[in-house]
């Protein structure tokens, strides 16, 4: 586990952190290109159409596991990040300055503002707050507060959709977001 220890209120290393995050982003980008994979964040608007959705459900404020935050809601921000949410824009950009400021804020007082995200099939796609997710993933945070809207797919015979419907029952009862179902019938156990 990678942990950085600093005194509260005196951290001002955002530019250095951005340089390190940029290296991680470019490394991920190159690795995905070499494998013939899409090197940027997945975009929810490109993955599904409204015709696939039965309804939307406001989930309110949820503590979302960062491992389950996998993409962005719209195409607008996708080219700013590699697929691992690390930045790929040059250090001389306004984006880099904002990312660096968020990094300093995280180390000095913590990022407290929730992001806005869509949840689809137990994965989260960021509507607002991509840089906050990036900074927290860089610092290996476990979760992030999010105001979540769930996009519920139409019920079908598709195994993953049926599994997801079982997960939603479990989630409604427990409120847990960090559980993945891999086998039908486990929700009742």
Where are the model-predicted features located?
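Short, charged/polar connector segments at secondary-structure boundaries
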Residues: 5-127, 131, 137-138, 183-189
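Glycine- and acidic-residue-rich phosphate-binding/metal-coordinating active-site segment common to enzymes
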Residues: 116, 120-123, 127-188
């Amino acid at each position: 586990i990678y942990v950085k220890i600093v005194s509260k209120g005196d951290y001002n290393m955002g530019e250095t952190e951005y340089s390190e995050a940029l290296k991680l982003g470019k490394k991920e980008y190159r690795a995905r290109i070499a494998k013939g994979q899409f090197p940027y964040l997945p975009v929810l608007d490109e993955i599904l159409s409204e015709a696939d959705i039965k309804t939307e459900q406001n989930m309110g404020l949820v503590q979302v596991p960062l491992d389950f935050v996998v993409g962005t809601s719209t195409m607008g921000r996708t080219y700013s990040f590699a697929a691992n949410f690390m930045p790929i824009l040059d250090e001389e950009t306004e984006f880099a300055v904002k990312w660096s400021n968020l990094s300093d804020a995280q180390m000095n007082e913590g990022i407290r503002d929730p992001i806005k995200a869509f949840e689809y099939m137990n994965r989260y796609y960021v509507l607002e707050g991509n840089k906050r997710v990036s900074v927290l993933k860089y610092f290996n945070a476990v979760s992030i507060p999010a105001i979540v809207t769930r996009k519920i797919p139409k019920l079908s015979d598709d195994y993953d959709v049926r599994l997801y419907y079982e997960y939603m029952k479990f989630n409604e009862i427990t409120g847990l977001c960090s559980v993945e179902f891999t086998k039908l019938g486990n929700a009742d156990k």
